[in-house]
UniProtKB/Swiss-Prot annotation:
InterPro entries on file: Carbohydrate_kinase_pred_CS (IPR017953), CARKD (IPR000631), Ribokinase-like (IPR029056)
Name the record gives this protein: ATP-dependent (S)-NAD(P)H-hydrate dehydratase
CDD domains: YXKO-related (cd01171)
Signal peptide extent: none
EC number per UniProt: 4.2.1.93
Binding site for (6S)-NADPHX: G107, N160, V161, M162, E163, Y164, R165, R166, D223
Domain of life of the source: Eukaryota
Key words of the record: ATP-binding, Lyase, NAD, NADP, Nucleotide-binding, Phosphoprotein
Organism: Entamoeba histolytica (strain ATCC 30459 / HM-1:IMSS / ABRM)
Keyword Transferase listed: no
Names of the cofactor(s): Mg(2+)
UniProt-listed PROSITE patterns: YJEF_C_2, YJEF_C_3
Amino acid sequence: MGGQLSIEARLKSIIPQLTFDSHKGACGKVAIIGGSVEYTGAPYFSGISALRVGCDLAHIFCHQDAAIAIKSYSPELIVHPFFKEDYDTNEVLKWLDTVQALVVGPGLGRDESVMEATLSILKQAITKNIIIILDADGLFLINNHLDLIRGKKNIILTPNVMEYRRLCDVLKVSHNTPCNKVALMLGGVTILQKGQVDEVSNGSYTVHVKHVGSPRRCGGQGDVLSGSLATFVAWSKLNQDFQDEDLICCSVAASALVKECSSFAFTEKHRGVIASDIIESIPSVFDQVFGQNKIQLIYE
């Protein structure tokens, strides 16, 4: 890890204590832009993971053809059928003033009109006091508009292997370019590069997450990560002592949590592990990793 960053100490400050006098919203609110007629599971996985980690409210802004399916998956999620012929971006922007974190991309699809609307929202969301996580089709979208995020300290990119390669292609660098160099090329945005060993960097700080995870790679794990990360960064924004480096700490925390959940689910379901099994393990695994007595993270 480059520089000195006390991840455990920051997380102790960031993770809110549960008290009987707290109110709804005190533990954070997040929003997800995603969901299309083909992909209804991804935004659900992201939103429900955010709730399982511990945020209070999760909004999903999706294509109207995906809304009923997502609503039927869980009554816990607040689903807005936004992408339609007469859409108004202000419908989303007014809600973004009430949340601390925004995930863009899960199941979004690549319909041209949806991409155009999402880009319009993203341009304005970046100026708000929220953290924005770009994943999946959100990364595909931003590859053509990297100047929009360059130098922005409220941005986290969460590319998998193929998404990282596409990002490197756009930047005209080798696929083997280290994460910290790519982060610097983008002006210090935070990157959580997913892999067997997740790497987190903003160019100044670099952390390798050493939790083992699972050999089972089922669909939806990236969505579980994006939702989990959204809750951690929402908590960080609610903290009066917020620091830009908290995005590194939150990314490490989310990575460690999802890898441990994946490992736990694998011991129970083996080859049959699906994303829902990983999500189901979040509450108990969270207490093991982030218990009140000691935060147990493995990284370097």
